Amino acid sequence: MTDCNKRQSARARKQRSCTKMEDCLIEDQTTFYSKAELYWKEVPPTVDGMLGGYGSISSIDINGSKKFLQKFLGEGEGKTGMGCALDCGAGIGRITKRLLLPLFRTVDLVDVTQEFLDKARTYLGDEAKRVENYFCCGLQDFQPQPERYDVIWIQWVIGHLTDDHLVEFLRRCRSGLRPNGLIVVKDNVAYEGVIPDDVDSSVCRDLNVLRRLVDQAGLNIIYEEQQQNFPEEIYQVPVTISKAVENNSGEESGWTIIEV
C-alpha cells in the first residue's frame, strides 16, 4: 500500500463514476484488500514503482508538500511540533526520506508490503537511524500509538480503504495525535463521485466525498491547497490538513480554506 497516480481520460472517469464506494465494489471486502496486496507485491521497490511510472514528478511532489507543511510547523496558534511524524502507505520511504526526516526528529513508517519496508532501511541511508518503527500492516488494521505524532501524513493510499474503514482509520489517527497535532491527506480526487480502479483494487473519491468522510471521523479540514505542476493526465491532487474537533461551536483555527 503506497503512493501512486491514476491515469484515465475525463470521459472514462465520468462513465465509471459511482455515487458512493459501495456501488463500485463488486467483490467482498476481503477480496478488495487481498487483490491490492497482491498488486503491490508485484511492483518494484523503486521511486518509479511507488509512483506508478511517474517517478519524474517526485521532486515536484515533495517540494509542493514541503512548502505546504512548513506553514504549520513551529510555535504559534494553529501550528504543531516537529518531534515525530507517521508516514502512512510509506512504501520504500520516498516521502519519509525527502519530506519528513528533514523536518522531524523521528519518523515511523507503515505499509502493507514487507518488501518495501525492507528496502526502506537501505533507501533511507544513514538517516534510517531516526526511523523508530517500521509497521507492516494494512491501514484498515493499523492502530497508532496514542498521542505519539505531531503530524500523520497520508498520501496516495486512502483509495485502498473502504469508506467505513477510512473513517475508522482517521478516528484512530486522531487519537494518535499529540496536542495541536495534524493529519494531512494528499491524494487524487475524482471529478465526480467515486471511481474504481480494477488494476490495483482501489477507488478515487471526489473532494466532497472525502470531506464528508473526514467530517464523520470527527476532524475539521482547516486548510486545503491544490498541488501544482503535475502532468495534465493525472487526477487533481489537493492537500488537506485536518485537526480534531474540540467543540461543537463550528469555529475553526483561523487558517484559510482554499477551494480547489
PLM feature spans:
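Class I (Rossmann-like) S-adenosyl-L-methionine-dependent methyltransferase catalytic domain
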Residues: 2-145, 161-172, 182-260
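Hydrophobic adenine-recognition pocket in adenosine-nucleotide-binding enzymes
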Residues: 157
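A conserved beta-strand element that flanks and buttresses the S-adenosyl-L-methionine
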Residues: 153
